[in-house]
UniProtKB/Swiss-Prot annotation:
Matches recorded under NCBIfam families: rplV_bact (TIGR01044)
CDD domains found in the cross-reference section: Ribosomal_L22
SUPFAM superfamilies from the UniProt entry: Ribosomal protein L22 (SSF54843)
Organism: Oenococcus oeni (strain ATCC BAA-331 / PSU-1)
Gene Ontology annotations for the cellular component aspect, listed alphabetically: cytosolic large ribosomal subunit
Single Gene Ontology MF annotation: structural constituent of ribosome
Gene3D superfamilies on file: Ribosomal protein L22/L17
Family classification: Belongs to the universal ribosomal protein uL22 family.
Protein name: Large ribosomal subunit protein uL22
Gene responsible for this protein: rplV
GO biological process: translation
């Protein structure tokens, strides 16, 4: 029962970026071809481009090495960022009080699959 695998997945856990900022980047590359996504990420000024670029690289490497898929045919099928654990810190304020600082983390997941429209 040999099943033909057409997708590969990569996930980065506890990335030190807020999920809201990561989602801004992921929304721009979702549904694009891998080469187009690399070009977009290279010139996008947002802060979350570096971890998304690394996860995309990992997903493409998984597709090529584990499942023998061609990089030119890959499309970003799914891209999402879930909330990871929040690190809580305190900043001293006036009159002996303190303000809470939440340092948010994300779990970034990208799934790449072969393009269904081959030759079209």
């Amino acid at each position: 029962m040999a099943e033909n695998v057409t997708s590969a997945k990569a996930t980065a856990f506890q990335v030190r970026i807020a999920p809201r900022k990561a989602r801004l980047v992921l929304d721009t590359v979702r549904g694009k071809s891998v080469n187009e996504a690399y070009a977009i990420l290279k010139f996008l000024p947002n802060t979350g481009t570096e971890p998304v670029y690394k996860v995309l690289n990992s997903a493409v490497a998984n597709a090529e090495n584990n499942f023998a898929l061609d990089r030119a045919d890959l499309v970003i099928k799914e891209a999402y960022a879930n909330e990871g654990p929040t690190m809580k810190r305190f900043r001293p304020r006036a009159k002996g009080t303190a303000s809470k600082i939440n340092k948010r983390t994300s779990h970034i997941t990208i799934v790449v699959s072969e393009n269904d429209k081959k030759g079209a």
